[in-house]
Amino acid sequence: MTDPIKVFGNVGSPYTQKMLSLLRYRNIPYSVSWGDVVQNLSFLNIEPPKPVLLPTMVFKDDEGLDICRTDTTPIIRYLEELYEEKSVIPSSPILSFLNYLLEDFADEWTTKYMFHYRWYFNEDADNAKKMLVLQHKIDIDDESMNQFGDIIADRQINRLWVVGSNDDTAKLIDQSYKRYLSLMENHLKFLPFMFCLLYTSPSPRDLAR
């Protein structure tokens, strides 16, 4: 592939940041469009995926037609087939399995930390909603920003149960997060990557952390 990969994402999306980190590290050409994915795809007459997830990345199929992909884990493996340089998948089957396991942990569990700390506490939610509004439009008056922000915040706060964040689990999530930070801090004092004893470049697990 020679054409830049089209990435449609959100600044606040950890999965968008995960894939941008991968593309930058592997020197894979890409262009990124921020904001409303469906709207941005419509500008290019590209049919959005179902469901629309972040990021949405556009590739060419065998007939040269645009096709959207959204799940970061298989996208990373697909990119391994397209580009040979600076592979991020450990060649050892054992390390590859551990990488897959830890990447899944990062994607499915550590995102609970993000959603919890972003939307559970009122002060954090107030800050998050303003940042997300300004991502879509920076020339906006305070009243409109607050109205738009309240819509975003209500939607996200009402969905906290989806990631398991509530009054009963708040303490567990906080304890898990602090334990995770402690383990990562100890590991990174001696090694720059998760698997660098035998593998000297970042893995998808590193990109997802």
Predicted features and spans:
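GST-like domain detector, emphasizing the conserved glutathione-binding G-site
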Residues: 1-143, 194
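Extended alpha-helical scaffolds
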Residues: 115, 119-198
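Conserved small/polar residues in nucleotide/adenosyl-binding loops
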Residues: 199-208
